[in-house]
Structures are given as structure tokens and as C-alpha cells.
From Swiss-Prot:
Protein name per its UniProtKB record: Purine nucleoside phosphorylase DeoD-type
Gene3D superfamilies documented for this protein: Nucleoside phosphorylase domain
Active site as annotated: 206 (proton donor)
Binding positions (a purine D-ribonucleoside): 4, 181-183, 205-206
The organism's taxonomic lineage, starting at the top: Bacteria, Bacillati, Mycoplasmatota, Mycoplasmoidales, Mycoplasmoidaceae
Organism the protein comes from: Mycoplasma genitalium (strain ATCC 33530 / DSM 19775 / NCTC 10195 / G37)
KW Coiled coil (keyword) present: no
Gene Ontology cellular-component terms listed: cytosol
GO molecular function, one term: purine-nucleoside phosphorylase activity
A Pfam family that the UniProt record links to this protein: PNP_UDP_1
NCBIfam families: deoD, PRK05819.1
Keywords on record: Glycosyltransferase, Transferase
């Protein structure tokens, strides 16, 4: 038990899927997990543990932004001894080749956030942190097996959703960032610090290139494909 998670240690699987929205965690549990049990609802951040194809999986929301996922992923890895966290979320396309609904495997992330530095993680000059390579390969293999197209590469992890500094977005494009999101850098920092495994999977929900955006219905449909990809990955991790 922590200040933010009330679950018993045995209630949390060694592999956790983390959407940003706790209601999506609830939806995944209801749609895909057998014998799903609510194990946390502190601050409305729902966590469910259940069975997917006879393997025990936990699905828990992480909230919005670096500080939020920083807290939840750290507590899961450090106090609940979770070995692997896969974030499943949305992103905004920065690269012209990314279309709405495309799947992005974020093998690396960069940010101007000081979170990683504050946690004592050594930051390279380019500020890029990497996902766990074995998870990146597993995600690609699983996507190919399930005939899902994907893009793999660098994402920009920003602190401000309503970003007004145009130079930051320009810099992100100059670094060949595929997309922008708000959590991957902190998740990877915690995994590096605690010697755990982490990966971020993203669905393109809007484009900063074409200024298009998915409807709520299409967001849910594309999110379903990504959630199933992550769930299929768990079969090789547990």
C-alpha cells in the first residue's frame, strides 16, 4: 500500500498495462479480462487485475503528464515489484508520414522535463531515454503477427498540453520526432532507475501536420487494436 495505491501487493500483476484515462482501464478490464477485480480506486485511478488467456494481468490508469505517471509507475515498480509496464495512449503526429489511427511504438523519448534529473537518472546531452529493447522487439513481432502496421522511433514528451512555444515543436521536428505525447520520458526514467522494463504504445489521435483529429468513436476503435496488441504481448511476458 502507498499513498496513492491501496491494493495489496499480491493484487498487482508483475506486468501492468497503463492507459492514461482510468475509465479506459475499466473498459479494458470489462471487455477483455476474465474474473476482473477492482484493486484500486484511490483518487479515482482505477486498477483492475484479471485473466487474459489464463495469464494474470493488471490494467491501471496513470493520469495525465509526467508527474502523474512518474508517481504511479514508480510506486508500482518500487513498492509492488512490478517488472514490466506498457503504457497505451494517444499522441499527436509530428511527422507527415503518420496518419490518424496509426500505431506508434515509442522506442525512445526526449523531453525538456527535469523529472529524470530529479530522480537521479543520468541524462545524455540529447535528452533521449530509451524503452526496453526486448519490449520494442516483442511489440514489433506481435504487431506483425497480428497484421498491424506500425511506426517505430522517437517521440517528444512535453510538459505543457497547451504549448505556446513554437520553437519547441520546431525542435521536435528537427530531431525527427514522430509524435508528441506527455508521459513516456518519465516512464522510461523510472524503468532505468529501478532496472525494470517499460514501453509506450501510441495511437495517433490528431495531427499537428494536417490538423485533423479522430472522432470519439474512431478513437475508441483504434484504441481497442492497441490494447489488444499490448494484451497479446503479455502472453510472452508472464
Amino acid at each position: 500500500m502507498t499513498p496513492h495505491i491501496s491494493a495489496k501487493k499480491d493484487d498487482i500483476s508483475k506486468v501492468v498495462l497503463m492507459p492514461g484515462d482510468p475509465l479506459r482501464a475499466k473498459w479494458i478490464a470489462e471487455q477483455f479480462l476474465d474474473q476482473a477485480k477492482l484493486v484500486n480506486e484511490v483518487r479515482g485511478m482505477f486498477a483492475y487485475t484479471g485473466q487474459y488467456k489464463s495469464k494474470t494481468v493488471t490494467v491501471m490508469g496513470h493520469g495525465m503528464g509526467i508527474p502523474s505517471i512518474g508517481i504511479y509507475s514508480y510506486e508500482l515498480m518500487n513498492f509492488y515489484e512490478v517488472e514490466t509496464i506498457i503504457r497505451i495512449g494517444s499522441c499527436g503526429a509530428l511527422a507527415p508520414q503518420l496518419k490518424l489511427k496509426d500505431l506508434v511504438i515509442a522506442s525512445k523519448a526526449w523531453s525538456e522535463s527535469i523529472y529524470a534529473k530529479d530522480m537521479g537518472v543520468e541524462i545524455p546531452e540529447d535528452k533521449i531515454l530509451f524503452a526496453t529493447s526486448s519490449l520494442v522487439e516483442l511489440a514489433k513481432e506481435t504487431a506483425i503477427k497480428n497484421k498491424l502496421d506500425f511506426h517505430e522511433g522517437l517521440v517528444f514528451c512535453e510538459d505543457a498540453f497547451y504549448q505556446t512555444r513554437k520553437d519547441v515543436i520546431s525542435l521536435a521536428k528537427e530531431k525527427n520526432s514522430l509524435a508528441v505525447e506527455m508521459e513516456a520520458h518519465a516512464l522510461y526514467a523510472n524503468a532505468i532507475l529501478l532496472k525494470k522494463k517499460a514501453l509506450t504504445l501510441l495511437t495517433v489521435s490528431d495531427s499537428l501536420v494536417t490538423h485533423e483529429a479522430l472522432s470519439s468513436e474512431l478513437r475508441q476503435k483504434s484504441f481497442k487494436q492497441m490494447a489488444l496488441l499490448a494484451l497479446e504481448m503479455t502472453q510472452k511476458l508472464i
